[in-house]
């Protein structure tokens, strides 16, 4: 086991494109860290830099107290699980798991003991003589994890390992990965664009955007107190409502500081009716434009009077902070499309951000 520390890590490609712009964070010994963000944010590039598959332009990466900037991937004592499994199709499951150990010159008895141990942990025993084409997607992913386990690494690295699986299998494998990491107590860094995956797996969540870290914290802290409007709109489904703090809204929030320019409220913190909010709270008149019933809850999509509906764009308050409002209500009862309703939020459900969306002010 080992901690992983990144200090002012940068990556600039030929031509001047800066993919990673001075990233700092630490993953404690035995922690499960998830890097999450949209496509192109730099999360996979950063993971590959930790693995040694991408060079570092500047900064330091430390694993277990050792700076590894110039250390070859095979000598970093890490194991990586890829999105596409990276299994040898002509080899059995047993040989896929044993291959790397044989290349390192490990004794046959030790190889067998490690493969059998991993097969027992992952319930792969009956499949050891099969080849990858005879396995389901979930079974192939377990073999890929088994190949990582047999190395007894200090750090596990996961690069979107579940993205090729169907929704039901993703949930099952997500649970299995978390159980496995806790059982082995090995430090892990996991990359995903799926915020639900990130929230359920992480001890430490690192939200990335444009090659930079937007926020670091526990999943619940990041959800409850997003540092920027990007985090507010990216973490959470449906996303946080972001509204420009114009005069009509500011007049309801007597304590709002003058530097606040955007008001945020989670869909679940809005309640339909009554017509007035509690002292310090918020009341909005909206016209219902769409309803989504998803079983135990319903999403009501509306637009404020005098505003046009606009798509919410994560991290771009000028485009996303408009008149659109999403309300999350329990059950299936909902007002009809076209009806004008009032929704209210209590003071503790309100979040204030700077006008550029880069700074949390209150809430």
Swiss-Prot record:
ATP binds at residues 37-44. Keywords: ATP-binding, Cell inner membrane, Cell membrane, Membrane, Nucleotide-binding, Sugar transport, Translocase, Transport. GO terms for molecular function: ABC-type glycerol-3-phosphate transporter activity; ATP binding; ATP hydrolysis activity. It is a peripheral membrane protein. Pfam families: ABC_tran. It is found in: Cell inner membrane. It comes from the Bacteria. Transmembrane segments: none annotated. It catalyses: sn-glycerol 3-phosphate(out) + ATP + H2O = sn-glycerol 3-phosphate(in) + ADP + phosphate + H(+). One of its GO terms (biological process) is glycerophosphodiester transmembrane transport. Belongs to the ABC transporter superfamily. sn-glycerol-3-phosphate importer (TC 3.A.1.1.3) family. Signal peptide: none annotated. Its EC number is 7.6.2.10. The complex is composed of two ATP-binding proteins (UgpC), two transmembrane proteins (UgpA and UgpE) and a solute-binding protein (UgpB). GO terms for cellular component: ATP-binding cassette (ABC) transporter complex, substrate-binding subunit-containing. Part of the ABC transporter complex UgpBAEC involved in sn-glycerol-3-phosphate (G3P) import. Responsible for energy coupling to the transport system. Residues 4-235 form the ABC transporter domain. NCBIfam families: PRK11650.1. This is sn-glycerol-3-phosphate import ATP-binding protein UgpC. Gene3D superfamilies: 2.40.50.100, Nucleic acid-binding proteins, P-loop containing nucleotide triphosphate hydrolases. InterPro entries: AAA+_ATPase, ABC_transporter-like_ATP-bd, ABC_transporter-like_CS, ABC_transpr_MalK-like, ABC_transpr_MalK/UgpC-like, Mo/tungstate-bd_C_term_dom, NA-bd_OB-fold, P-loop_NTPase. PANTHER family: MALTODEXTRIN IMPORT ATP-BINDING PROTEIN MSMX, SN-GLYCEROL-3-PHOSPHATE IMPORT ATP-BINDING PROTEIN UGPC.
């Amino acid at each position: 086991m080992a901690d992983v520390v990144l200090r002012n890590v940068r990556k600039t490609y030929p031509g001047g494109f800066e993919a990673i712009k001075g990233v700092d964070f630490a993953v404690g010994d035995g922690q499960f860290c998830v890097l999450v963000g949209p496509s192109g944010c730099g999360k996979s590039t950063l993971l590959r830099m930790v693995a040694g598959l991408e060079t570092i332009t500047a900064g330091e990466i430390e694993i277990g107290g050792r700076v590894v900037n110039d250390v070859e991937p095979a000598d970093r004592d890490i194991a990586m699980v890829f999105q596409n499994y990276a299994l040898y199709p002509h080899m059995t499951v047993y040989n896929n798991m044993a291959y790397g150990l044989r290349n390192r010159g490990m004794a046959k008895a030790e190889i067998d003991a490690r493969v059998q141990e991993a097969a027992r942990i992952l319930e792969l025993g009956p499949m050891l003589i099969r080849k990858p084409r005879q396995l389901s997607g979930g079974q192939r992913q377990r073999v890929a994890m088994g190949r990582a386990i047999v190395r007894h690494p200090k750090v596990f690295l996961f690069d979107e390992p579940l993205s090729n699986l169907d929704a039901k299998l993703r949930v099952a494998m997500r649970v299995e990965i978390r159980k496995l990491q806790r059982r082995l107590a090995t430090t892990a860094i996991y990359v995903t664009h799926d915020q639900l995956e990130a929230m359920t797996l992480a001890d430490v969540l690192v939200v990335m955007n444009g090659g930079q870290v937007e926020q670091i914290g526990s999943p619940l802290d990041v959800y409850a107190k997003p540092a920027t409007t990007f985090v507010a709109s990216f973490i959470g489904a449906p996303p946080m409502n972001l509204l420009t703090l114009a005069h009509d809204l500011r007049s309801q929030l007597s304590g709002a500081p003058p530097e606040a320019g955007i008001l945020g409220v989670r869909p679940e913190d809005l309640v339909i009716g009554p017509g007035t909010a509690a002292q310090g709270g918020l009341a909005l008149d909206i016209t219902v434009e769409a309803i989504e019933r998803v079983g135990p809850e319903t999403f009501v999509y509306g637009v404020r009077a005098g505003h046009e509906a606009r798509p919410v764009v994560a991290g771009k308050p000028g485009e996303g902070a408009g008149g659109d409002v999403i309300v999350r209500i329990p059950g299936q009862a909902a007002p009809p499309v076209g009806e004008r309703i009032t929704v209210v939020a209590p003071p503790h459900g309100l979040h204030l951000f700077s006008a550029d969306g880069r700074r949390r002010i209150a809430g």
